[in-house]
C-alpha cells in the first residue's frame, strides 16, 4: 500500500487533515496538497516501544486542546510534541519514564527536536 494514496482516500471522505504515525520513523501530515514529514526523535537506547503511539496521540491532542485555533501551523507543532513524548515513552518499561518527566525535560527535548529539524 501507498501512504499518500491512503491519505488522499481518507481526505476524500471529508477529513481536512490526516496524520499517519510511522513508529520510530515519525509521522506524515496531509493537508490539501501539503505533505509534512516529521521524523521520529532519534534515541540510542530504546527499552520498550509499548505506549509510544498513545503518548504521541495524547501529546498531539493535548497540545491542540491548549490552543484557540487549529490550523496547519498548530497541527505541525502538535506533531512535534507527539514525536517528543513518544520518544520519552520508549526509554523505560511501562510508564516509568513518563512518570518522572518534568516540564523542563519536555521543553529541553522540544528545543533539541526543533534544532534537529530546522535547516
Question: What function would you assign to each model-found segment?
Answer:
Residues 1-119:
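Conserved phosphate-binding/catalytic region of the ribokinase-like
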